[in-house]
């Protein structure tokens, strides 16, 4: 489960995951935490 600060972060994370990037990478890029 990803925890993003806001909707923008979540959208960023989801887009990043959609293009098959690792969760950790996406979380870092988008300012999200992996719980």
From Swiss-Prot:
Main location class = secreted
InterPro entries documented for this protein: Thionin, Thionin-like_sf
* Keywords for the protein's UniProt record, in alphabetical order: Antibiotic, Antimicrobial, Cytolysis, Disulfide bond, Fungicide, Plant defense, Secreted, Toxin
Q: Where are the transmembrane segments?
A: none
Q: List the disulfide bonds.
A: 4-32, 12-30, 16-26
Task: Kindly list the places in or outside the cell where this protein is found, as annotated in its UniProt entry.
Answer: Secreted
Q: Name one Pfam family in it.
A: Thionin
Annotated Gene Ontology cellular component terms: extracellular region
Q: The organism sits in which domain of life?
A: Eukaryota
* Protein family per UniProt: Belongs to the plant thionin (TC 1.C.44) family.
Q: What does this protein do?
A: Antimicrobial peptide disrupting membranes. Has antibacterial against Gram-positive bacteria S.aureus (MIC=6.5 uM) and B.subtilis (MIC=3.25 uM) but not against Gram-negative bacterium E.coli. Has antifungal activity against C.albicans (MIC=3.25 uM).
Supply the name of the protein: Thionin NsW2
The top of its lineage is:
Eukaryota, Viridiplantae, Streptophyta, Embryophyta, Tracheophyta
């Amino acid at each position: 489960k990803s925890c993003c600060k806001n909707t923008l972060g979540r959208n960023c994370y989801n887009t990043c995951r959609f293009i098959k990037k690792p969760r950790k990478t996406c979380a870092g890029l988008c300012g999200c935490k992996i719980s």
